[in-house]
């Protein structure tokens, strides 16, 4: 379970590029797991700063998404991950320039970029990004779990 932010400005979504896990090479939303004794808001602020370099100016909860993700581990074994995401609408603090992405052991992203919503497609976006696009367009999130298969094809 993790907390993630949807940040849209001028028709573009702020996304990160994943370097490990089932979404390797894909765009994903900034966010991640809470640390012990960390509130949801504290976690999303920390994750945004670590992964994008931006401080968040405003927050409002949107809802949750529920995914089952099939993928192939580096040892070629298949795995099923149950991913529960708590989503927040976020706005970056435009009064402060973005810092560089924080590098640390376990960092799972390599860059943060603003991508036009029209350019984010299934082929290079995580399920969270796809749900974010649907939410921006419709104002609603699905109530049922979705299943995605990223297993390596023989």
Give the location of each predicted region.
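Conserved N-terminal beta-strand and adjoining loop/helix that marks the start
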Residues: 1-13, 85-89
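Charged phosphate-binding loop/patch that engages nucleotide di/tri-phosphates or the phosphate backbone
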Residues: 129-154
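Short, glycine/serine-rich, charged loops/turns that create anion-binding
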Residues: 12, 20, 66
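A conserved beta-turn-beta hairpin within the catalytic core of GNAT-like acetyltransferases
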Residues: 22-25
């Amino acid at each position: 379970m993790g907390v993630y932010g949807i940040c849209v400005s001028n028709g573009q979504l702020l996304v990160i590029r994943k370097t490990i896990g089932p979404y390797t090479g894909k765009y994903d939303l900034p966010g991640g797991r809470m640390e012990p004794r960390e509130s949801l808001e504290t976690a999303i602020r920390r994750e945004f700063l670590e992964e994008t370099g931006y401080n968040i100016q405003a927050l409002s909860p949107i809802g949750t998404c529920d995914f089952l993700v099939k993928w192939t581990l580096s040892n070629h074994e298949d795995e099923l991950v149950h991913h529960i995401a708590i989503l927040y609408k976020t706005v970056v603090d435009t009064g402060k320039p973005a810092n560089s992405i924080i590098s640390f052991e376990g960092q799972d992203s390599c860059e943060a970029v603003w991508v036009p919503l029209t350019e984010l497609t299934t082929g290079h976006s995580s399920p969270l990004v796809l749900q974010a696009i649907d939410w921006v367009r419709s104002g609603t999130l699905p109530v049922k779990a979705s299943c995605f298969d990223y297993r390596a094809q023989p």
